[in-house]
Amino acid sequence: RPFWYRTEFELPSSYSEGKRVWLHFDNTNRFADFYFNGEKISGTKTSTKDVSGHMLRSKFDVTNLIKKSGKNVIAVLITDADQKKTRKAKDPYGVACSPSYLAGAGWDWMPYVPGRLAGITGNAYLVVTGDVVMEDPWVRSELPTLQKAELSVSTDIRNASSSPKEVVVSGVIQPGNISFSKDIR
């Protein structure tokens, strides 16, 4: 059956006007619909089960919805995949609906877990940034020999404003003190 998570918070006095506020969820499991101060922030106003999958990250720009003073409310509706209603599977433990969490369905020594681990299964938090944010950075290493490594850095850049921005992406890879910098227009 569906169930709700709900919490309230106030912005700290150190919050600076003109900054973006992002609401992050590291993991939600199965189906999730997100609300902020009574407004639906995932999918469309009439859609349901907007975030669908196992252990999915979600990020929402709540800058225009946040109250600078007073209480802000976050609510998340979680819906588990009810196997009996969603498909005619012969798997009574729900593994067909939870392939990434076989342990949640029970195997060998572990009993079945009601709800198949549905819910908010990671951290939820706010991040305050400028208009341009870096998302999902990673470093790939190719090792042609044991004495040499070729590194490539990749990331997505999101401009949340309506005007073009110029930014510099820079960083240092440790160990080795390997620095990099790139102008982005």
Give the label of every model feature segment.
Residues R1-V133, A160-S161:
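Accessory beta-strand-rich segments of carbohydrate-active enzymes
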Residues V127-S162:
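Surface beta-strand/loop "capping" patches
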Residues T46-S47, W138, S163, R185:
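Residue-level structural signal for beta-strand termini and adjacent loop
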Residues F34-F36, K148-R185:
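Beta-strand-rich binding/interaction modules
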